[in-house]
A protein has these predicted regions:
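Structural motif
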Residues: 78, 110, 136-139, 208
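Extended, well-folded catalytic/binding cores that form a central cleft or groove in large enzyme
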Residues: 113, 128-133, 140, 168-171
Length: 320
């Protein structure tokens, strides 16, 4: 787990590329309506489930339990490669206590599976601000057996963040990662911290989603003009500032031979990277923001002449 844009998918892909992760099934939970993380992880695991458009700790909790049950029986029937563990990548807004309660309680998941650990990524650049401003980010850190400070290559100083994390959760093992590179294996990250389960029970108080956070999904047509997109996104960041928490998506820009992956984290700049993706990878952009309506986001793109490139969709704001 880890707050929006902390680098969960980058780290998970790196961990799954190791030979000791060959027997790992993966469940990816996405907040928005586009399963981008699922597409970025394709090939990293032979056994993968996608839970999109909701959080596993509330709207998708039943679906998570059903997916775990499906995996269990498909494994026994040899319909999928044999696995010895399941990794769940939650949304950036999820409180992991709900997943912990389900797997540790008197449920089918609790009977089939044994809980191991919570691994929480904290953005080395924005982590201190996230812990102060967002209850979900602080809860994720407090629940962790392993705390990983990510993006250390981009952070000027992580001393203050380390001190904050030690105060918030002194039991967790602290790691550092850069571009997905971590000096610990998946096996090591599955080891629980001493006394962690008792501490987690005390922290399990129900969902802590930040009020007013919404997501919207803009569906792009092919041959999206790059200059107009760049200008529209620049206006988006200028208008909403830190309230624009996260944006991620896939675009097929005019004249480019490959689709591009779009990634943005609050306070940064958008990263646009050509990528080899599956043919069915959906083109579009998920925008996750605080106190911003989907209509406001769409209007900015329309104002830059991108209206004809936006396919008609039922844009939704998901209040958590």
């Amino acid at each position: 787990t880890g707050f929006l844009g902390a680098g969960k998918t980058t780290l998970l892909r790196a961990l799954l590329s190791s030979p000791d992760a060959a027997d790992t099934a993966v469940i990816v939970n996405e907040f928005g309506e586009i399963g981008l993380d699922h597409h970025l992880l394709v090939g990293a695991s032979e056994t993968m489930y996608l839970l999109e458009n909701g959080c596993v700790c509330c709207t998708q909790r039943d679906d998570l339990e059903a997916s775990l049950e499906d995996l269990y029986w498909a494994r026994l029937r040899r319909e999928i490669p044999w696995f010895s563990r399941v990794v769940v990548e939650t949304t950036g807004l999820a409180d992991p206590s709900g997943v912990f309660a389900m797997v540790s309680g008197d449920t089918l998941a609790g009977i089939r599976y044994v809980w191991q650990s919570v691994v929480t990524l904290v953005d080395g650049v924005n982590g201190s601000e996230t812990l102060e401003a967002h209850a979900a980010g602080a809860q994720q850190a407090a629940m962790a057996d392993h705390l990983i400070i990510s993006k250390t290559d981009l952070a000027a100083d992580i001393g203050d963040l380390r001190r904050r994390l030690q105060i918030l959760n002194s039991d967790a093992r602290l790691h550092q990662a850069s571009r997905g590179a971590l000096g610990a294996s998946l096996d090591a990250l599955m080891q629980p911290a001493p006394g962690a389960d008792a501490r987690r029970l005390g922290l399990s108080g129900g969902p802590l989603h930040d009020a007013g956070i919404t997501s919207c999904w803009l569906h792009f047509r092919p041959s999206l003009p790059r200059l107009e997109f760049d200008a529209a996104f620049a206006d988006l960041t200028e208008k909403f500032g830190v309230d624009l928490l996260r944006a991620k998506g896939i675009a097929h820009f005019a004249g480019d031979p490959k689709p591009s992956v779009l990634q943005y984290v609050a306070g940064g700049t958008i990263e646009i990277t050509p990528a080899d993706l599956a043919a069915d990878a959906p083109a579009g952009l998920v925008v996750i923001a605080s106190k911003v309506s989907p209509g406001e986001v769409e209007n900015i793109f329309v104002a830059h002449g991108l209206g004809p490139y936006l396919m008609a969709e039922d844009h939704k704001g998901h209040a958590h």
